[in-house]
């Protein structure tokens, strides 16, 4: 790939991330599940995390079995998604969607790759999720502080 082509790809990626963040910050108000997140989940996640997927409770009982059938915990509703944001599996959504910039190893979460078809789309969708969550943390329920929990916005409407 030529230097000019690389510059063009980088410029498009930066512009996409900037535009996504700006659209949320200006004019649209705070990011919400209904307005911003639901569409991303529908387009990128529901083939494995839809209404035919197991509840979190059922998934925990047979994770390997469900993984073999390409089924993860159900994310088809706001309530089901919130289990992985600040519920019984606090931080799971953030750990799995993170691009690796929140870890010392720099390794993206195992579901980051499904956030979009291109790096620019993945980055833009991650920006939306981060704005929606607010207090983006990779900590588990037993590790998270009260202040960090309060920083999680994750508005439904």
Summary of predicted features, one role per range:
Residues 25-157:
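Aromatic- and Gly/Pro-enriched helix-to-coil junctions and flexible linker segments
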Residues 18-25:
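Sec/Tat signal peptide C-region and signal peptidase I cleavage site
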């Amino acid at each position: 790939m030529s230097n000019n082509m690389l510059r063009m790809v980088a410029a498009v990626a930066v512009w996409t991330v900037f535009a996504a963040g700006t659209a949320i910050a200006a004019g649209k108000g705070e990011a919400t599940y209904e307005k911003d997140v639901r569409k991303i989940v529908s387009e990128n996640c529901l083939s494995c995390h839809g209404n035919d997927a197991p509840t979190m409770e059922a998934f925990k009982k047979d994770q390997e079995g469900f993984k073999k059938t390409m089924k993860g915990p159900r994310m088809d509703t706001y309530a089901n998604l919130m289990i992985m944001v600040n519920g019984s599996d606090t931080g799971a959504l953030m750990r799995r969607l993170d691009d690796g910039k929140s870890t010392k190893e720099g390794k993206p979460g195992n579901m980051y790759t499904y956030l979009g078809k291109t790096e620019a789309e993945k980055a833009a969708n991650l920006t939306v999720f981060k704005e929606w969550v607010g207090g983006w943390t990779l900590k588990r329920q037993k590790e998270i502080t009260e202040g960090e929990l309060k920083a999680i916005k994750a508005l439904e409407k």
